[in-house]
């Protein structure tokens, strides 16, 4: 790893710099007004001034900042729940996101410009962050079981497949997916599951000693949950048309998330012994409402519909963690470390189906058939792309860690000589997590 990883990382960054030099320019007022025709009235575009375009940039920049925080802080800390994998969870999240946003900019820009030079503005910045979200979701499915080189390769391959599917959904199918329940969440989850299935190892089937949390690691992960929960309305509304569409996307997401929290807490207490809450459910299922409502967030659905979607998503997510994750691991040989299928996969599919129902009720001008095609395309391309990527990552040259060193920072990081985990531990009765003895 000492030479392979630095060489590949530096080579890729040099390639990014060259590609940006060849194809990317600043966005000017003239090309910005053409590019954002869908966001402005045509009669106003001819009079768009430089100051007006700057105003538009800075109007959208707060939404971009919110999405940026979700990508780097929210996803990063959500990955820190493993007791010996906190450095890798938040550290590799930063690395993959930084690489992914550059590659996502290139791939999406070239596809939408048909291979020609394109201009880089605020919408490109937001969409670049969106493209990295797919990788970070998939990263959760293989967390602790892959080397940095494998993660790097997966980022490059997955974003290429994602960009192709996103172009197909938005340009050819002309489907509505403002909050990206289908193109980001469902796609990222099933891509990651496909990779995890190919990389499955029987040695990790039984409980690995490092595949668990401790009190403080769950607390750090909860910080990620809170950042994601707070900023999710910005994620679902960032690329919505300004005005009523953006307003509806914010409000519907806000209420869907609130309703989701209530049902997630209720179901967590219901399915656990003695009615106690499971921190895994609270960290993840409370976010499912934001995932599920994403596709129809900007549609003219009533608030009670958004709340219903969020409530059902919370139930689906908790039940998935309790019953479906063990089934995936034991029967289908797919070990999903973070449970991305329950947070992103199932709620993402549910969100796509909800959008079809909303369209059938006349709440959007999109086509039901194209919406269904978009959902099928997102899942199908994710599974096929994930299987092929998994086969590439399975090659022995990529330094995949052996079973005994999985979920351990010391494989890739310099860790402090003294760690809390070096002290004695005890386990409370009827408690699944190891806790530090005081």
Curated annotation (Swiss-Prot):
Cytoplasmic compartment segments: 1-4, 83-86, 143-148, 200-218, 271-278, 322-342, 394-438
Keyword terms, alphabetized: Ammonia transport, Glycoprotein, Membrane, Transmembrane, Transmembrane helix, Transport
Gene3D superfamilies for this protein: Ammonium transporter AmtB like domains
TM annotation in the entry: 5-25, 62-82, 87-107, 122-142, 149-169, 179-199, 219-239, 250-270, 279-296, 301-321, 343-363, 373-393
Pfam families to which the protein is assigned, alphabetical: Ammonium_transp
Loss of function: phenotype: Homozygous knockout mice lacking Rhag exhibit normal growth, development and fertility. Mice exhibit no significant change in body weight and body mass index.
Record's subunit section: Homodimer. Heterotrimer; a RHCE monomer interacts with a RHAG homodimer. Component of the ankyrin-1 complex in the erythrocyte, composed of ANK1, RHCE, RHAG, SLC4A1, EPB42, GYPA, GYPB and AQP1. Interacts with GYPB (via the N-terminal); this interaction bridges the (RHAG)2(RHCE) heterotrimer with the SLC4A1 Band 3 I dimer complexed with GYPA.
Family affiliation: Belongs to the ammonium transporter (TC 2.A.49) family. Rh subfamily.
Identification of the protein by name: Ammonium transporter Rh type A
């Amino acid at each position: 790893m000492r030479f392979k990883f630095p060489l590949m990382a530096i080579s890729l960054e040099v390639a990014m710099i060259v590609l940006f030099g060849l194809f990317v320019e600043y966005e000017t007022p003239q090309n910005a007004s053409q590019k954002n025709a869908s966001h402005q009235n045509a009669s106003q575009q001819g009079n768009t001034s430089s100051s007006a375009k700057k105003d538009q940039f800075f109007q959208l920049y707060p939404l971009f900042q919110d999405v940026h925080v979700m990508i780097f802080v929210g996803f990063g800390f959500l990955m820190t729940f493993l007791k010996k994998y906190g450095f890798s969870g938040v550290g590799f999240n930063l690395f993959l996101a930084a690489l992914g946003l550059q590659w996502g900019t290139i791939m999406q820009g070239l596809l939408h410009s048909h291979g020609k030079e394109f201009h880089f503005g605020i919408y490109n910045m937001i969409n670049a962050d969106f493209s990295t979200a797919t990788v970070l979701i998939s990263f959760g499915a293989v967390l602790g079981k892959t080397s940095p080189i494998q993660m790097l390769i997966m980022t490059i391959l997955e974003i290429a497949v994602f960009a192709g599917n996103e172009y197909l959904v938005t340009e050819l199918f002309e489907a509505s997916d403002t909050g990206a329940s289908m193109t980001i969440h469902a796609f990222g989850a099933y891509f990651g599951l496909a990779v995890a299935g190919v990389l499955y190892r029987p040695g990790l089937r039984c409980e690995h000693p490092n595949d668990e949390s401790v009190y403080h690691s769950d607390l750090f992960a909860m910080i990620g949950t809170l950042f994601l929960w707070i900023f999710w309305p910005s994620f679902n509304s960032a690329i919505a048309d300004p005005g009523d569409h953006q307003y509806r996307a914010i409000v519907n997401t806000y209420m869907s998330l609130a309703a989701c929290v209530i049902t997630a807490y209720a179901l967590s207490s219901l399915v656990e012994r003695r009615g106690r809450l499971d921190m895994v459910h609270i960290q993840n299922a409370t976010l499912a409402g934001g995932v599920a409502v994403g596709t129809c967030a900007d549609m003219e659905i009533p608030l009670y519909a958004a709340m219903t979607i969020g409530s059902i998503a919370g139930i689906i997510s908790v039940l998935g963690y309790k019953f479906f994750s063990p089934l995936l691991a034991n029967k289908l040989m797919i070990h999903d470390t973070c449970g991305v299928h329950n947070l992103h996969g199932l709620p993402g599919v549910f969100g796509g189906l909800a959008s079809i129902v909303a369209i059938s009720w006349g709440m959007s001008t999109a086509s039901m058939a194209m919406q269904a095609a978009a959902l099928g395309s997102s899942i199908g391309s994710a599974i096929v792309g994930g299987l092929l990527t998994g086969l590439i990552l399975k090659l022995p040259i990529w330094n995949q860690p052996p079973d005994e060193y999985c979920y351990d920072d010391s494989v890739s990081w310099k860790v402090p000589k003294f760690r809390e985990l070096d002290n004695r531990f005890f386990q409370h009765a009827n408690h699944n997590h190891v806790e530090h003895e005081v």
